[in-house]
């Protein structure tokens, strides 16, 4: 992959890390190239791997109460940390966080861009326009999107072209959403096993 990132939204904080040189999803197992912390995160840590203890209400093992999104990137533009998901931005309502699979282009008045990644056009719809209602007039291409709204609530959407699969782990009230069905099965199995479920 050409980058990996994740974001966690809990009742107390929103936390994010981004990496290059993705290795495997088991224990995340990545080499950190840089760290991006959202302003309300609890503290900054630079180290190899992921340490959920830094988040206070998220234990190092077991289930945490919150939403988690992750994205493994296959670059359609420059491979660099700024183009690695999740993308974050702020407007009058608060902070938006999104990950996107697909390829989109922008049609309309120019909006501010910080990267060369097409996903930023989708984020701008939430920040500067009318969210997904703006896609029809301003976005061409295909997209599957997962993110957090300013209230920290998870949202998932896709158009009629982008693949998106979902599994639900009843005992954890946990949804797993992936654009690849095999990834969805593997991640679901990993979460079930890690939490001692069958």
Language-model features: locations:
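Conserved short alpha-helical segments that host acidic/polar catalytic motifs at enzyme active sites
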Residues: 1-198
């Amino acid at each position: 992959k050409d980058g990996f990132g994740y974001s966690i939204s809990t009742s107390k904080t929103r936390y994010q890390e981004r990496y290059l040189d993705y290795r495997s999803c088991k224990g995340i197992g990545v080499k950190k190239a840089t760290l991006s912390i959202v302003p309300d995160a609890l503290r900054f840590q630079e180290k190899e791997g992921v340490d959920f203890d830094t988040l206070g209400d998220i234990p190092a093992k077991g289930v945490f109460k919150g939403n988690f999104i992750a994205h493994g990137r296959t670059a359609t533009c420059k491979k660099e940390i700024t183009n690695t998901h999740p993308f974050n931005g702020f407007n009058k309502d608060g902070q938006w966080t999104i990950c996107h699979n697909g390829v989109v282009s922008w049609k309309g008045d120019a909006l501010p861009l910080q990267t060369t990644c097409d996903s930023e056009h989708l984020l701008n719809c939430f920040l500067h326009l009318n969210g997904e209602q703006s896609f029809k007039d301003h976005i061409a291409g295909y997209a599957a999107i997962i993110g957090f709204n300013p209230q920290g609530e998870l949202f998932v959407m896709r158009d009629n072209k982008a693949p998106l699969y979902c599994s639900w782990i009843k005992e954890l009230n946990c949804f797993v959403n992936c654009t690849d069905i095999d990834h969805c099965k593997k991640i679901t199995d990993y979460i079930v096993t890690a939490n001692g479920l069958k």
